[in-house]
């Protein structure tokens, strides 16, 4: 068989038949969609298999246990499959994510989009966590389709994303990063875009992304299909819908209905407590719900950090996590995954997790700080009781916030049950917090910044019927946080601070006047560098500013405009008495002179419960009389002391009895040792033995021996050559049997001499 020439086309019948099969499947799918009427067939569909969707999409849904349709999915998916614009509104946790992901996948399948067709679907989410969650759901249900999907969020490498963004068919991201790529990325072509999805549109507008969304809409073709989903329908959302949607179909909650309703399986409670008792109540709540999954909301990130660090040191017995906007992206994702997989845990968070995130099986949602409006309350409590599960919520309200907030919620048909706290179950932790702040300056600094950020968050709220900063007990709240005093707060004009906070750094730099040069552009002399030197052993600049009352640091939760030029007149300077001689200057710096201005020293001690006391505490006469009659106090004191002495007497008698027994044991032991020593000394005396015997002929007869017969003395063996140890020699004195008196006298003399 001859080989085909190089460059000649090769007809592959299998490939051609496969393409024809795909086209036939798409045509059949389009025919089913055209014949489908959402108005008449809505009552007959209850599962995904009843929808005109492809086999691959249905298989991916079935593998992830997505079988039945929710209300919003039943109304939105059929309309979106017919390529019409949709404006969907539904309660939180109702399944809005699948309501737009399924139509997006089916739209790309019917248009026969491949990896060479570029960007075909764009999904905009308000937060990074929600974008990541949407991307994960897309990869699960779309695993049997050949589309390429990408995720672009803040906190990642922009250059890395630009190199690969041109090959994506579906792009999911946050408004800021998508707008940046549309302006800067060369390969990001949007002329072939088929679908645009705006998820949690109201949240995007509340977070200040209106300009970014307008920029995104300006880059997209007019012929696209737009799906807008939101939990509430505010005026801003309606304005956005008029600009981005063409003859939209409204599904879910109608436009004349109130704020999104609360899930029916959610139990809602609120308690009325003072601002100073919130930390105590939160601690008591955690200690009594150790086998629960709890989500705690604060109004600022500094409060989240302080509560996390303080409770972590106190060890409540449950896993603690924290999540706020200034976290790094990797840390935020890690925290989100840990809390999702945990069975019993507590997450301290800001409103960054109040929208769209699906944490499974949350038992309690606790709002330590009052939400800014009813919509924020709805989104916070919507993290629990999702998809028909059971859940509970608890709202802590200060006395100045109760009346106004309850009225706002009742106006939106949200009723709360009031809960009373049993004082015996309430645990006070302010002494422990005070002890921790005394031992750790960093925790004290966090507490000061948490106090300031909370006061500022209350001050900038628009609803002054609820948020009354002048009625808050600042001194008591600072004491409850464990602070030694009330920090100084410089609240400046907050108008435009939110816009400045959400504005990019490049635009903020362009708005500055040209005369105000940055410190890096100024020429610094040798003397400038000398005065700018700082000792390396001092605390951080941020902490020093806090100690001095300057709370306008760059890491604060709110931006404030600082004054650049400080003009101080000469008459405003204080008249200081400067020493004129070395002797006077040395005397002024002496310890004796410094003690005059400092006053008397004070020393504090901590008891076992962490409460501070002065080293010497005396009771006044008035305090003594206020406790009752002196004779009754005397009798009570004497009875208490007698009872204490009787208890101590029993212990003393037992101690004395043990001492006597021990003394008796030692005396017996000494007697035993003395007796053994006497027996040992007696055995040594018996070693000298006297033997009485008769005449010894061999000894008495002295045989003459020649020198030849004498043997030389043998060599003394070494200590290691001796086979047996030498025994102690016994002195034996042998004498003949005495016969006369002279023999007895000689024997006696010999014994005495030996």
Curated annotation (Swiss-Prot):
PROSITE patterns: DEAD_ATP_HELICASE, HELICASE_ATP_BIND_1, HELICASE_CTER, Q_MOTIF. It catalyses: ATP + H2O = ADP + phosphate + H(+). Its EC number is 3.6.4.13. It comes from the Eukaryota. Residues 265-429 form the Helicase C-terminal domain. It is found in: Nucleus, Nucleolus. ATP binds at residues 90-97. A motif (Q motif) lies at residues 46-74. One of its GO terms (molecular function) is ATP binding. Keywords: ATP-binding, Helicase, Hydrolase, Nucleotide-binding, Nucleus, Ribosome biogenesis, RNA-binding, rRNA processing. ATP-dependent RNA helicase required for ribosome biogenesis. Involved in the release of U14 snoRNA in pre-ribosomal complexes. Required for pre-rRNA cleavage at site A2. Belongs to the DEAD box helicase family. DDX10/DBP4 subfamily. The Q motif is unique to and characteristic of the DEAD box family of RNA helicases and controls ATP binding and hydrolysis. This is ATP-dependent RNA helicase DBP4.
């Amino acid at each position: 068989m001859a080989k085909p020439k190089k460059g000649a086309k090769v007809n592959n019948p299998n490939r051609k038949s496969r393409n024809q099969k795909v086209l036939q499947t798409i045509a059949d799918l389009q025919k089913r969609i055209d014949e489908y009427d959402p108005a008449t067939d809505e009552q007959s569909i209850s599962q995904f298999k009843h929808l005109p969707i492809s086999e691959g999409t249905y298989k991916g849904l079935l593998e992830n246990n997505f079988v039945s349709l929710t209300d919003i999915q039943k109304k939105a998916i059929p309309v979106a499959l017919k390529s019409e614009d949709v404006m969907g509104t539904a309660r939180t946790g109702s399944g809005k994510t699948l309501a737009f992901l399924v139509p997006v996948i089916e739209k790309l399948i019917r248009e026969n989009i491949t990896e060479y067709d570029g960007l075909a679907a764009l999904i905009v989410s308000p937060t990074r966590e929600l974008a990541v969650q949407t991307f994960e759901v897309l990869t699960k249900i779309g695993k049997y389709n050949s589309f390429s999907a990408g995720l672009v969020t803040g906190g990642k490498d922009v250059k890395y994303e630009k190199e690969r963004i041109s090959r994506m068919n579906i792009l999911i991201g946050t408004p800021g990063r998508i707008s940046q790529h549309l302006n800067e990325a060369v390969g990001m072509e949007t002329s072939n875009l088929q679908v645009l999805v705006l998820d949690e549109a109201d949240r995007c507008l509340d977070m200040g992304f209106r300009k970014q969304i307008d920029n995104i809409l300006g880059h997209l073709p007019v012929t696209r299909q737009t799906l807008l989903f939101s939990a509430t329908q505010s005026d801003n959302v309606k304005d956005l819908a008029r600009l981005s949607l063409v003859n939209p179909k409204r599904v879910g909650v109608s436009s004349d209905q109130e704020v999104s309703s609360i899930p029916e399986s959610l139990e809602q409670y609120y308690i009325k407590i003072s601002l100073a008792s919130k930390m105590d109540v939160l601690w008591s709540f955690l200690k009594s719900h150790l086998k629960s999954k709890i989500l705690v909301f604060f109004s600022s990130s500094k409060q989240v950090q302080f509560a996390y660090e303080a409770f972590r040191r106190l060890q409540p017995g449950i896993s603690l996590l924290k999540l706020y906007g200034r976290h790094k992206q990797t840390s935020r994702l890690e925290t989100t995954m840990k809390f999702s997989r945990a069975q019993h845990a507590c997450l301290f968070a800001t409103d960054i997790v109040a929208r769209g995130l699906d944490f499974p099986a949350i038992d309690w949602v606790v709002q330590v700080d009052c939400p800014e409006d009813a919509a924020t309350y709805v989104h916070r409590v919507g993290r629990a009781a999702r998809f028909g599960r059971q859940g509970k919520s608890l709202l802590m309200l200060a006395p100045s916030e109760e009346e106004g907030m309850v009225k706002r919620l009742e106006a939106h048909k949200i009723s709360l049950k009031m809960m009373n706290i049993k004082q015996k179950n309430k645990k006070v932790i302010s002494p422990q917090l005070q002890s921790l702040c005394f031992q750790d300056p960093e925790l004290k600094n966090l507490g000061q910044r948490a106090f300031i950020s909370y006061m500022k968050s209350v001050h900038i709220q628009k609803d002054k019927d609820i948020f009354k900063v002048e009625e808050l007990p600042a001194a008591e709240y600072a004491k409850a946080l464990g602070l030694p005093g009330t920090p100084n707060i410089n609240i400046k004009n907050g108008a435009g601070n939110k816009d400045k906070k959400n504005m990019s750094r490049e635009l903020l730099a362009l708005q500055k006047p040209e005369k105000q040069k940055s410190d890096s552009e100024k020429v610094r002399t040798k003397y400038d560098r000398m005065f700018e030197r700082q000792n390396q052993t001092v605390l951080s600049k941020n902490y020093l500013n806090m100690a001095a009352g300057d709370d306008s640091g760059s890491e604060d939760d709110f931006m404030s405009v600082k004054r650049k030029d400080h003009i101080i007149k000469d008459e405003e300077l204080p008249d200081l008495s400067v020493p004129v001689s070395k002797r006077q200057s040395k005397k002024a710096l002496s310890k004796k002179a410094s003690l005059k201005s400092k006053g008397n020293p004070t020393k504090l001690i901590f008891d076992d419960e962490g409460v501070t006391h002065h080293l010497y505490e005396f009771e006044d006469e008035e305090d003594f009389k206020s406790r009752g009659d002196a004779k009754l106090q005397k009798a009570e004191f004497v009875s208490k002391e007698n009872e204490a002495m009787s208890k101590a007497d029993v212990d003393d008698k037992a101690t004395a009895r043990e001492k006597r027994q021990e003394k008796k044991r030692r005396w017996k032991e000494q007697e035993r040792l003395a007796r053994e020593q006497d027996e040992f000394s007696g055995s040594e005396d018996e070693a000298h033995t006297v033997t009485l015997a008769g005449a010894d002929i061999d000894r008495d007869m002295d045989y003459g021996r020649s020198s030849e017969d004498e043997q030389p003395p043998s060599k003394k063996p070494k200590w290691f050559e001796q086979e047996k140890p030498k025994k102690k020699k016994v002195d034996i004195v042998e004498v003949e049997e005495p016969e006369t008196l002279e023999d007895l006298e000689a024997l006696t003399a010999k014994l005495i001499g030996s």
